[in-house]
């Protein structure tokens, strides 16, 4: 595989951009409130141990369950998009498991089960709970 696609999902202000910047050294805008609109991307290029060039496509998505409420169609489209094209999907949540996060997990599960046009079958899904902007912040 010459291209690995990694996507991050989660509610607005859950630390999605911050996580991608930390993990991959990207420079997505990160602050409280809405920063990302739609899907932003960054490509990382590197050589593997055999000297072959590889790429990682990093996708930073707009927050779902936004306070600037749209209908749930937007959330479904973002989730289905991520599931259809990604090898790895990271789901961020600021805080403990709650009702909105449960809805996100249900959306992801539905997307995996119901998507027949998926670019890849069965992406790897990771859920990150208690994502804090400052690891020393206990709130």
Each language-model region and where it sits:
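Conserved GTPase G-domain substructure that encodes guanine base recognition and part of the catalytic core
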Residues: 1-139
